[in-house]
Amino acid sequence: MAEKEEAIFRSAEMALVQFYIPQEISRDSAYTLGQLGLVQFRDLNSKVRAFQRTFVNEIRRLDNVERQYRYFYSLLKKHDIKLYEGDTDKYLDGSGELYVPPSGSVIDDYVRNASYLEERLIQMEDATDQIEVQKNDLEQYRFILQSGDEFFLKGDNTDSTSYMDEDMIDANGENIAAAIGASVNYVTGVIARDKVATLEQILWRVLRGNLFFKTVEIEQPVYDVKTREYKHKNAFIVFSHGDLIIKRIRKIAESLDANLYDVDSSNEGRSQQLAKVNKNLSDLYTVLKTTSTTLESELYAIAKELDSWFQDVTREKAIFEILNKSNYDTNRKILIAEGWIPRDELATLQARLGEMIARLGIDVPSIIQVLDTNHTPPTFHRTNKFTAGFQSICDCYGIAQYREINAGLPTIVTFPFMFAIMFGDMGHGFLMTLAALSLVLNEKKINKMKRGEIFDMAFTGRYIILLMGVFSMYTGFLYNDIFSKTMTIFKSGWKWPDHWKKGESITATSVGTYPIGLDWAWHGTENALLFSNSYKMKLSILMGFIHMTYSYFFSLANHLYFNSMIDIIGNFIPGLLFMQGIFGYLSVCIVYKWAVDWVKDGKPAPGLLNMLINMFLSPGTIDDELYPHQAKVQVFLLLMALVCIPWLLLVKPLHFKFTHKKKSHEPLPSTEADASSEDLEAQQLISAMDADDAEEEEVGSGSHGEDFGDIMIHQVIHTIEFCLNCVSHTASYLRLWALSLAHAQLSSVLWTMTIQIAFGFRGFVGVFMTVALFAMWFALTCAVLVLMEGTSAMLHSLRLHWVESMSKFFVGEGLPYEPFAFEYKDMEVAVASASSSASS
């Protein structure tokens, strides 16, 4: 077997393969390909509506089964029953033994079993709900009966309102009905607590105040089966005269969803009613317990198998969706499918299908052939758990064009390094490294956990965070900065005077060179900020120039690979001369200025900003000469940059105008030329597929379908963008200096305002203040300086890669490689997704 291509510098070489699958093994073949996870199928029926495709009925049937399984899962959640998740590795491991899929009869059993269980569970749920309604009704009835004395005796322990003549009602303890009169009637019931005031107000207006209204709060909330919520309710009684008025009261109460009950006014009658209600409740409790036990037993049995059923059904549905992308040869009863696969995986594909055929015990000819095609293949970069995060950073911006240089490879180093320039602090980098190491060392355990969106994002980028922390420790070492303090590792290159007075300004004398990084003697000096600002600002320009230059040379590698000499001559060379003639020259001047001992020469260091401005505004005029013949060099570079603009603008369009000839391009054959005559129907199908493909996309390289005007407009836009971007992108790298300065200053302020204050106390107070302020300092350091500042620096580094770097070479118009592969489907995610789809 040939060694696999690394496919990290450039995308893997892809092959378009065609499958001739006998109908009897089409399902097994699709299962094998799904487990292998290497083939990205092309839709050969893109013009056929979904409901007109061959296997639409099978997909609808499995959709219904998925709905039923989601219903089962919702019942498990409702009854707090945990779903048993079995071993899913057998479905996902493409390198292990072949997974034997469930047969068609087993899938049919799944369908029948799902329908049977759904019907049975619905019946038990309905029965439980009905019993629950009856139970709630009887419990409310019992509460009213138990509150009879409170209702029928006038007391101070209930809320009551009388709109009748107070002379009709005697002192406490007298029966209200007897006091009001023999003709009085009453209505008792239970109503939601938030509707009590509404009921009372409506009755007062309708009956013109001719009523006596009393309520008692039910302490325990009542479960509402319809809304699946607990509600607070009140029991009430309304006294009034006349049967007609009582009927009106009942209608008003029922319109407000009140439950009305018949309550005897005598103590003996209420006692008999209460005994009967208690007996009925006892019977209901027994029935409800039995029904609930039966329902939970069913659900526990379902919980053990539901995940396995769901995985099998979702895979079966995915199989039919893939088969729906194939064409069917009715004459030979075969399915014809096409798909993209990495060319170095062809042997693996043939071997796996051969194993499947041997397992099935059938004898069929080779069912795979590689097609010559002019279609644009998808872009596939091989990644591992370390490189996947960096690759996803670039893929979020755009998918690389097929076989162009992958921006994700250099990003592995440059992304954390650019971050570290802005975040450079050994202490903060160490905290970030510790956090990332905890994720890396426990990745197997965490990988099996259900993770929230934010934590999953951090876990996926754990290696990115690890490198950001390590690089930050490195740049922090160069900056000599650890929690805003310095480290005196080496002997300083500066010597302070031996004798000085407090408040006196003193000047250090240079006695050597600090071995590596910034000298700790600069810390705390008056001109420390001036020095670090100048150093970091120039460093940012140099880092930006280097980053953009090597990115620009990637475009040369792409032009050479695609054999596009006109892009080299018309785009790369003038662009390189323009960028190097201005910003390359500035970078060389920065390094040269650092290398010269201006104090020894006895003259001030020239300002580079004024030099660059005067280079354009006053060519040939030099205020402070940096080096001999500077004026001539700058005039030459300026003229070279000016020549590069029309060069960049005109060469490629003029080359197109004088050399381009319209040619008729015929589509490449998609089948072998020596096909036998008995394959006529298959050839017709393939020809139809090629015709559809020709309409779907314009393929091939070159400028097919473009005219001189299109090329000219494109080149004008490219020239303007390139010239402006050289300026704006170089200035954009100054964010490296700005964020590094802000991070260092914020770290210093935080130290000064918290833990440094604690060092001024002594004794027990000093210990307490040190502990308290250290906790405050550490919490703010982690929350603000590491998390917030780290996120900000990461986003700025992301911007520098997406815009400033990748714009120099990255086309980003590729197609993503999305092979057909079985994935583990989480039930909770599936239910949430279905709910959101239904709501939208």
From Swiss-Prot:
Superkingdom, taxonomy of origin: Eukaryota
GO biological-process terms attached to the record: cellular hyperosmotic response; cellular response to alkaline pH; polyphosphate metabolic process; protein localization to vacuolar membrane; protein-containing complex assembly; proton transmembrane transport; vacuolar acidification
Effect noted on mutating residue 425 to N: Reduces assembly of V-ATPase complexes and reduces ATPase activity of the assembled complexes
Signal peptide range: none
Effect caused by changing residue 593 to A: Reduces ATPase activity
Modified residues (N-acetylalanine): 2
GO molecular function: ATPase binding; phosphatidylinositol-3,5-bisphosphate binding; proton-transporting ATPase activity, rotational mechanism
Effect of residue 814 to D: Reduces assembly of V-ATPase complexes
Primary localization class, coarse: membrane
Residue intervals annotated with topology Vacuolar: 424-425, 487-534, 594-636, 745-765
Gene Ontology CC terms: fungal-type vacuole; fungal-type vacuole membrane; membrane raft; vacuolar proton-transporting V-type ATPase complex; vacuolar proton-transporting V-type ATPase, V0 domain
Membrane topology label: Multi-pass membrane protein
Keywords, comma-separated and alphabetical: Acetylation, Coiled coil, Glycoprotein, Hydrogen ion transport, Ion transport, Membrane, Transmembrane, Transmembrane helix, Transport, Vacuole
Annotated phenotype, changing residue 780 to S: Reduces assembly of V-ATPase complexes
Outcome of substituting residue 746 to S: Reduces ATPase activity
Job description of the protein: Subunit of the V0 complex of vacuolar(H+)-ATPase (V-ATPase), a multisubunit enzyme composed of a peripheral complex (V1) that hydrolyzes ATP and a membrane integral complex (V0) that translocates protons. V-ATPase is responsible for acidifying and maintaining the pH of intracellular compartments. Is present only in vacuolar V-ATPase complexes; enzymes containing this subunit have a 4-fold higher ratio of proton transport to ATP hydrolysis than complexes containing the Golgi/endosomal isoform and undergo reversible dissociation of V1 and V0 in response to glucose depletion.
Quaternary data: V-ATPase is a heteromultimeric enzyme composed of a peripheral catalytic V1 complex (components A to H) attached to an integral membrane V0 proton pore complex (components: a, c, c', c'', d, e, f and VOA1).
Family membership noted in the UniProt record: Belongs to the V-ATPase 116 kDa subunit family.
Miscellaneous section: Present with 55714 molecules/cell in log phase SD medium.
Protein name, as recorded: V-type proton ATPase subunit a, vacuolar isoform
Natural source organism: Saccharomyces cerevisiae (strain ATCC 204508 / S288c) (Baker's yeast)
